[in-house]
């Protein structure tokens, strides 16, 4: 049944549209007129005329052409008539009985200053909105992400970077919480980095970067929160867009956004199909040392081809119960079939670098990932402005199945089977009560309940002493209650909050009949203060207590292998990391230039870190060095830094923006483990000091220029600085993206040529030391490239939509910290 769901969703949507447009046998009349801008008498193309029959309650209407004229055929009857246009004040004409053709003449609309900053449309440039507890980056008309995915979008957001494996970091910290529409979501999937690559960029409206979250948000994510807000059609009538992308290496994508809105309902949808097949590679040179002398070495040269077929559908219906309340139901479905073929050429050498052994290890992997999510939202805006109640329910069911066959000449083929299934249930209620003109009280509850099973099977088992097969059950229930109070006193505003979270975790290892259950209850205070020095200058100060919960794969003690000599295993003794975060921000608008700077500091205890240790194991009849990578709780980490972003609109044809982040992290901690020497059969207790200080930086520059013949040119340059830890040194990475776009078909269509990673330089080069850099017994020199340079051509066509040539109301740079919205 679940495999037929995409067809059912599409049938439901198209059937609804057909019924909405069924003609009747009543006599039709013609209604004509012209809609213009009040100040200039300029015609308004795509203005919407809405007709509501007072007897049947049917909604009909039409839109104006490029000269502002409309000509609507409609049955005779009595109608409520309104004329609407985005960011303009709507006009409600008197209810009237229409029995014959009528010309309404010229209808003038005036701009609505209160709604200028609420326009949901693809604008010319990404803009910045600063509030007490978050910054909002509107995706806008960003050519470099056309035909891309959510990872591409996040990598273009200031303060955010995405590494070559798809891991997302905020201000250099990878422990960032990613939400979809303000809630944990199945769209992030069981494997977050991979799932983000399957979410089309065209489906994203904006990204909220929350470095000092208020009490309304989850306490999880020591770096902060990234909230991805999806597009939902808001314009009246039937409208939408179609996007198609082709590229090399093999890429094809087709996506549609369809919307049908009337007075009582809004039906919106996103459908997408994506196929990709791309090469990648890695090279590893591993050397073993004794007293500083090389005793053996190993070279692994790996190439692969990743293949994906992905379909996603998101269909929602918003029903307006009253003018103040609405009910919205959404169904999301995604299915991805993937394949990964890799060849790993292995060469082994002795202490004199004489070749002692060669092998080729081939892995052929197929996967099937399926997710369905149901969401229901009720919103009631009471009569008093800002008085609001929202209730949410969300349920998701995800399944991931993978089968990998490992082949090596001279040995029996090995099959790895992974079956994972997860259900998530979320219940949430938020209540906002204004008290007077500048005061606000808020309270709410969130329940987040996750159940997961993971079954990993290896056949046959070559070494019974190290059988990696395992079956794990994981359950995590979180109950959260919060309250917050906000006030504005002249130029000052503040938002004080307190959140209580109770977490119950149950881990079952079915193969060994082991249980690992634990519970904890913690308080998380938040403070956000704003000061509006002038109309163009503002300051913010934020404090929040955060945590990082260990994920189920970090708690699973059974082993999984990246290769024969590199093994990852979880640690069931992990406990959460707790972080105190402070953030001081400054915003200044100087003519065409906008500057946003901040200084931040974070102190973490029981910091979760991945470490590497060495074991000697028998592999194919030989004693070989094996690297075991596992997570542990280090003592503490202090992280502080400075960042700034800037926008400069030199003219309508030339725009620049950039960001820079400089940070330092200091880690303290001791790692103790047992080392068994197979020659003497003696166990030695090894103690490694993993204390370290690392200074690094990130920089991004973006330029957009309008060339002759109305061709848009955009270039994005980014640099991810080098990083160091007690066991790793990673070199800096420079990359560049380039795009050209041209409006066609009377600006209803857009062609975009995009070159991602122009210089094919997006590679990770790292040195890994075991046990540490001061006294290594192993040094691994690795180069890794997830995907190569990509060239794509995207075409998008909009119907019943207006392409905005310039964002009305100027830059939406912020409210100076006046808002209380969390």
Model-inferred region functions:
Residues 73, 150, 156, 183-211:
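Short acidic/polar hinge/loop motifs at secondary-structure boundaries
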């Amino acid at each position: 049944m679940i495999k037929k769901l995409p067809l059912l969703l599409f049938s439901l949507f198209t059937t609804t549209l057909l019924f909405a447009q069924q003609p009747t046998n009543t006599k039709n009349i013609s209604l004509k007129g012209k809609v213009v801008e009040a100040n200039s008498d300029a015609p308004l193309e795509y203005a919407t005329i809405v007709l509501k029959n007072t007897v049947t309650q049917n909604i009909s209407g039409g839109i104006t052409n490029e000269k502002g004229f409309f000509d609507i055929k409609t049955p005779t009857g009595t109608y409520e008539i309104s004329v609407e246009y985005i960011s303009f004040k709507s006009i409600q004409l008197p209810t009237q009985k229409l029995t014959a053709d009528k010309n309404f003449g010229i209808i003038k609309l005036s701009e609505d200053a209160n709604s200028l900053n609420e326009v949901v449309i693809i604008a010319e440039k990404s803009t910045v909105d600063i509030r007490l507890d978050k910054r909002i980056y509107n995706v806008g008309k960003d050519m470099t992400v056309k035909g891309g995915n959510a990872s591409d979008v996040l990598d273009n957001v200031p303060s955010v970077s995405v590494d070559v494996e798809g891991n997302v970091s905020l201000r250099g910290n990878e422990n960032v919480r990613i939400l979809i529409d303000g809630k944990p979501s199945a769209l992030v999937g069981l494997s977050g980095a991979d799932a983000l690559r399957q979410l089309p960029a065209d489906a994203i409206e904006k990204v909220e970067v929350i470095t000092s979250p208020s009490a309304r948000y989850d306490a999880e994510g020591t770096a902060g929160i990234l909230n991805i807000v999806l597009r939902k059609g808001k314009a009246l009538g039937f409208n939408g867009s179609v996007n198609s992308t082709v590229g090399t290496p093999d890429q094809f994508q087709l996506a549609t956004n369809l919307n049908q809105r009337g007075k009582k309902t809004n039906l919106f949808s996103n459908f997408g199909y994506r196929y990709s097949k791309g090469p990648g590679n890695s090279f590893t040179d591993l050397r073993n040392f004794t007293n500083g002398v090389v005793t053996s070495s190993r070279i692994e040269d790996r190439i692969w081809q990743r293949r994906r077929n992905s379909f996603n559908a998101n269909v929602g219906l918003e029903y307006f119960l009253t003018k103040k309340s609405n009910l919205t139901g959404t169904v999301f479905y995604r299915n991805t079939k993937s394949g990964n073929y890799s060849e790993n050429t292995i060469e082994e050498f002795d202490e004199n670098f004489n070749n002692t052994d060669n092998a080729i290890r081939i892995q052929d992997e197929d996967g099937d990932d399926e997710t369905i999510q149901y969401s229901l939202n009720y919103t009631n805006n009471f009569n008093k402005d800002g008085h609001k109640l929202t209730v949410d329910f969300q349920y998701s069911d995800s399944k991931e199945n993978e089968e990998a066959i490992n082949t090596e000449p001279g040995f029996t083929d090995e099959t790895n089977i992974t079956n994972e299934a997860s259900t998530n249930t979320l219940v949430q209620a938020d209540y906002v009560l204004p008290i007077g003109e500048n005061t606000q009280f808020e309270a709410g509850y969130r329940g987040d309940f996750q159940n997961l099973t993971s079954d990993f099977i290896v056949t046959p088992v070559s070494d019974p002493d190290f059988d990696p097969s395992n079956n794990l059950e994981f359950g995590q229930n979180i109950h959260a209650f919060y309250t917050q109070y906000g006030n504005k006193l002249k130029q000052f505003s503040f938002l004080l909050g307190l959140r209580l979270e109770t977490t119950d975790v149950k881990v079952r290892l079915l193969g060994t009949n082991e249980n690992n259950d634990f519970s904890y209850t913690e308080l998380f205070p938040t403070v956000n203060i704003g000061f509006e020095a002038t109309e163009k200058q503002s300051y913010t100060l934020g404090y929040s207590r955060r945590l990082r919960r260990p994920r189920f794969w970090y708690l699973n003690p059974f082993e999984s292998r990246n290769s024969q000599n590199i093994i990852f295993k979880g640690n069931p003794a992990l406990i959460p990391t707790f972080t105190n975060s402070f953030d001081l921000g400054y915003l200044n608008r100087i003519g065409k230039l906008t500057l946003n700077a901040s200084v931040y500091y974070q102190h973490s205890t029981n910091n979760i870190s991945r470490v590497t240790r060495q074991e000697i194991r028998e592999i194919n009849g030989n004693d070989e060095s094996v690297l075991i990578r596992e997570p542990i709780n280090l003592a503490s980490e202090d992280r502080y830094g400075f960042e700034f972003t800037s926008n400069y609109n030199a003219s309508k044809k030339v725009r620049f923006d950039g960001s820079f982040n400089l940070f330092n992290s200091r880690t303290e901690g001791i790692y103790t483990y047992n080392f068994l020497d197979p020659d003497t059969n003696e166990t030695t207790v090894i103690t490694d000091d993993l204390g370290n200080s690392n200074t690094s930086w990130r920089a991004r520059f973006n330029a957009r220029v309008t060339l002759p013949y109305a061709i848009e040119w955009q270039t994005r340059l980014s640099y991810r600085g080098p990083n160091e830890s007690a066991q790793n040194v990673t070199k800096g990475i420079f990359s560049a993206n380039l795009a050209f776009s041209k409006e066609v078909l009377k600006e209803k269509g857009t062609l975009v040529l995009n070159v991602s990673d122009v210089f094919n330089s997006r590679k990770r080069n790292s040195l890994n030391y075991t046990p540490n850099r001061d006294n290594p017994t192993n040094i691994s020199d690795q180069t890794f490239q997830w995907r190569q340079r990509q060239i794509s051509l995207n075409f998008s066509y909009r119907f019943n939509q207006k392409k905005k040539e310039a964002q009305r109301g100027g830059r939406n740079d912020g409210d100076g910290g006046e808002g209380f919205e969390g």
